[in-house]
Regions:
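A Lys-centered signature of the CheY-like receiver
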Residues: 121
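Residue-level signal for the "D+5" position in two-component response regulator receiver
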Residues: 36, 74-75, 92
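Non-catalytic signal-transmission and effector/linker regions of two-component phosphorelay proteins
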Residues: 1-9, 15-35, 41-44, 48, ...
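Conserved phosphotransfer cores of two-component systems
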Residues: 57-61, 85-92, 113
Length: 147
């Protein structure tokens, strides 16, 4: 897949959760241009075209949506969100937290940092797939981004 034609960047360390998300998006034909990275550090490399993505990606080719977990190795989703919102080139990118954390401090911190939406992953696959369908439909088809 061309790293410059990504609609969704999925940042998820749990392979089972990543697979469920991808399956949910595929079920509704919204996973054609999805790219998955397993941690926050690689997410920033991808977004900012650094590290192993240096010379392979154009930073101006932004994903239409970033689905971001909070609890990850190397760099948390909150730290990734801070970096995205702190850079003029990426501060308007749509970021949706997709996590199992229902902790009020996590929710509050993410909204303070400018997250577009905070979604707690439903436990049942059918509910999860429906949530993913609605999320993809809204962010990829209905939403009009400023960029």
């Amino acid at each position: 897949m061309d790293a410059n034609s990504i609609d969704i960047l999925l940042v998820e360390d749990n392979i089972d959760d990543a697979e469920l998300t991808i399956r949910g998006l595929k079920k509704y034909s919204m996973a054609n241009n999805l790219f998955h990275v397993p941690d926050g550090e690689e997410a920033l490399d991808f977004i900012f075209a650094t590290g192993k993505y240096l010379g392979k990606r154009d930073i101006l080719q932004r994903p239409k949506l970033i689905l971001l977990d909070i609890q990850m190795p190397k760099l948390s989703g909150i730290e990734v969100l801070k970096k995205i919102r702190g850079d003029e080139r990426t501060r308007l990118m749509p970021v949706v937290i997709l996590t199992s954390s229902r902790e009020d401090p996590d929710i509050k911190k993410c909204y303070e940092l400018g997250v577009n939406s905070y979604i707690v992953k439903p436990v049942k696959f059918d509910n999860f797939a429906e949530a993913i369908k609605n999320l993809g439909f809204y962010w990829l088809l209905l939403n009009q981004p400023p960029i």
